[in-house]
């Protein structure tokens, strides 16, 4: 990482993972915010740390774009992650949380990089195409499909150069089915 230009110590890892090592990392005074993905024990530990924490289950990882981020780079990384193999990899970001102070700039950059924001009038039909609402899980039909194919199934017309599809949500959980894992370029 340092050879690629990152500052010394910017990228670190725990060579032998354990809950004790993870707890020590979360308790470290140099850690301001925790992003926890994995089993319920990991998420509960993060929420109990006394620090701001974002917790998700296995395979439903969010990304957070903080106010000081390099917006162009952050958006590029997310578009690459979600468009590689049409987002089939469970480690690809399933959602993005954006600091409100840079929201408009991030949205413009996503659009500049080919992202299509699903219009509010199309949201219900898009949601029911992407998520099996009865089972509250991804519709297997859309897994690994192109943005063009998913939009076509939803009855939405998108530009030919669309890289990913974005649905703006105001929350997460059962009331927001699109906040679930999607395994697609959504």
Predicted regions mapped to residue ranges:
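Residue-level signal for inorganic ion chemistry
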Residues: 11, 34, 99, 150, ...
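Rossmann-like NAD(P) dinucleotide-binding subdomain of oxidoreductase/dehydrogenase enzymes
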Residues: 1-73
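ALDH superfamily catalytic-core signature
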Residues: 43-173
């Amino acid at each position: 990482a340092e050879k690629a230009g990152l500052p010394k110590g910017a990228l670190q890892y725990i060579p032998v993972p354990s809950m004790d090592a993870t707890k020590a990392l979360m308790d470290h005074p140099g850690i301001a915010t925790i992003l926890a993905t994995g089993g319920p024990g990991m998420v509960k530990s993060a929420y109990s740390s006394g620090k701001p924490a974002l917790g998700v289950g296995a395979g439903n990882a969010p990304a957070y774009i903080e106010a000081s981020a390099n917006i162009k780079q952050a958006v590029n990384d997310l578009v690459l992650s979600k468009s590689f193999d049409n987002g089939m990899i469970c480690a690809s970001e399933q959602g993005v949380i954006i600091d409100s102070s840079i929201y408009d700039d991030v949205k413009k950059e996503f659009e500049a990089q080919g992202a299509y924001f699903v219009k509010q009038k199309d949201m219900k039909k898009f949601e029911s195409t992407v998520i099996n609402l009865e089972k509250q899980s991804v519709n297997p039909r859309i897994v690994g499909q192109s943005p063009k194919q998913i939009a076509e199934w939803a009855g939405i017309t998108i530009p030919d150069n669309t890289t990913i599809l974005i649905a703006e949500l105001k929350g997460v959980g059962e009331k927001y089915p699109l906040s679930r894992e999607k395994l697609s370029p959504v």
